[in-house]
């Protein structure tokens, strides 16, 4: 099966520029994990045995799962000039001389999706972090009889109008499904907030 990956590469004049880039990308991944995916991570440097083959330094973000195992959620590598020399990648500097650039590479994979599921899921389904949820709020009107439908739907629309500028709201007014079916369906989909 295909392993999906978001990856980037840069080349720099100086080692310091490459170091700054590699650390900045790690910070971006940590920011996403913590502030969008809602998962705390630890930023660190991999040991010589764990670093990316050919890298000078490998940085990573790691998250602790419910089973007390760590999951590597993203990496960023300082490659030095190792790959530019191996593949004869050069640039012409300001003195018109050929130089080998200092490179970086960085990436996250579908493992990050697994991290979100492992961190926020439970035995009933997925619980998406609000910033990632396609629908942040689902409103499920419970209409006991046709005579109440108009007033209940007016209330549902008032709720929607009051929150739709701040949240992504879905009104589940499907008449052919029971409230219990809808509750279960939206719980499985991981909607953070359900209003009945």
Across the structure, where does each feature detected by a protein language model lie?
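NTP/phosphate- and nucleic-acid-binding module
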Residues: 1-196
């Amino acid at each position: 099966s295909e392993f999906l990956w978001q990856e980037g590469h840069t080349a720099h004049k100086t080692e310091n520029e490459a170091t700054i880039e590699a650390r900045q990308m790690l910070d971006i991944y940590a920011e996403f994990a913590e502030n969008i995916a809602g998962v705390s991570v630890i930023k660190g440097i991999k040991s010589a045995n764990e670093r990316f083959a050919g890298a000078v330094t490998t940085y990573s973000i790691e998250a602790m799962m419910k089973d007390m195992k760590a999951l590597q959620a993203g990496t960023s590598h300082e490659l030095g000039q190792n790959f530019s020399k191996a593949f004869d990648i050069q640039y012409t500097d300001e003195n018109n001389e050929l130089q080998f650039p200092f490179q970086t590479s960085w990436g996250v994979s579908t493992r990050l999706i697994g991290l979100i599921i492992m961190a926020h899921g439970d035995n009933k389904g997925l619980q998406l972090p609000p910033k990632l949820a396609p629908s942040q709020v689902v409103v499920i009107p419970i209409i006991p009889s046709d005579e109440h439908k108009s007033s209940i739907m007016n209330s549902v629309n008032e709720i929607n109008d009051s929150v739709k500028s701040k949240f992504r709201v879905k009104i589940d007014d499907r008449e052919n499904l029971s409230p219990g079916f809808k509750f279960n369906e939206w719980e499985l989909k991981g909607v953070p907030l359900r209003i009945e």
